[in-house]
């Protein structure tokens, strides 16, 4: 079966135009009405600041302050994990030349930085759970031109391999979450390889995880055809993982997780929905715009370095 050329049936253009006109005519609420009734459209205040939607002691994002008149004043950004400014973590990482993403996972989950024994044990747990369940490649075989879409399906697919998928005890949810943290890079790389094969018409490569690698090293070694990467590349990716680990509990994808989990649904459904939110161009999709901007700078700016 040629997945790349299979298409979803579409209505003819005239029919769709008529239906859309009918829909728009009867499904519109003007912004003035929302403002008059105090509805926070997009969970934003009129000045663009976020709406308080919950409390968390896991992460805090500081990007502005307000003066006495309530005007928003931009300030140098701060990202604080469990009371620790990530700049301190970054300084520590470069001072001692080590990878810190695994430490940050522990910090976010358990509230404090791990000691060496805890870190070693945790890294071993992650390494043991990088591999996907036996038979899971059947799920991977249906490709997608969008890797985020494929990740959603992969996460939902793991439900079928979990005998306790609906168990909402703390022990089971934590176990599922750690397994997802460990296996997500593997699913991501495999989704990319399937996209290369079916949509980019290039060769795909599947490499087994190597013992003793950090998450950043694991991604690079399984992503590259020759499994080669520099230490500098791995450290840079480690930093990227660090700064994207959490953004305060109020961002779109985290808020989505909280909405779904509040209904009592399973872990896989909640995380898959969060990935769908992260896929949106107004949230995680902004990274693609940054990448395009960097490429444009390299192409059109003389001496960009």
Language-model regions: role of each:
Residues 2-305:
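Hydrophobic alpha-helical bundle cores within soluble ligand-binding/oligomerization subdomains
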């Amino acid at each position: 079966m040629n997945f790349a050329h299979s298409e979803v049936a579409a209505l003819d253009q005239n029919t769709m135009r008529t239906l859309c006109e009918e829909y728009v005519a009867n499904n519109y609420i003007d912004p003035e009405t929302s403002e008059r009734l105090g509805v926070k459209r997009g969970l934003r205040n009129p000045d663009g600041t976020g709406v308080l939607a919950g409390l968390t002691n896991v992460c805090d994002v500081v990007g502005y302050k307000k003066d006495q008149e309530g005007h928003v004043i931009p300030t140098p950004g701060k990202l604080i994990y469990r009371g620790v400014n990530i700049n301190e973590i970054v300084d520590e990482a470069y001072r001692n030349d080590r990878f810190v993403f695994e430490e940050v996972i522990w910090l976010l989950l358990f509230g404090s930085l791990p000691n060496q024994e805890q870190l070693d044990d945790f890294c071993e747990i992650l390494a043991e759970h990088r591999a996907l369940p036996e038979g899971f490649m059947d799920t991977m075989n249906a490709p997608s031109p969008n890797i985020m879409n494929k990740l959603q399906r992969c996460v939902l697919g793991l439900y079928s391999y979990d005998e306790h998928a609906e168990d909402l005890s703390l022990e089971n949810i934590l176990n599922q979450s750690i397994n997802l943290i460990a296996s997500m890079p593997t699913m991501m790389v495999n989704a990319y390889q399937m996209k290369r094969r079916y949509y980019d018409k290039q060769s795909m490569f599947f490499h087994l995880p190597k013992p003793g690698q950090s998450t950043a090293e694991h991604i690079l070694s399984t992503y590259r055809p020759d499994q080669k990467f520099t230490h500098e590349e791995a450290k840079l990716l480690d930093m990227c993982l660090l700064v994207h680990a959490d953004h305060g509990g109020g961002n779109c994808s985290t808020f989505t997780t909280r909405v779904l989990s509040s209904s009592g649904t399973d872990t896989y459904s909640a995380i898959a929905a969060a990935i769908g939110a992260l896929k949106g161009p107004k949230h995680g999709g902004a990274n693609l715009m940054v990448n395009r901007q960097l490429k444009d700078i390299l192409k059109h700016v003389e001496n960009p370095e």
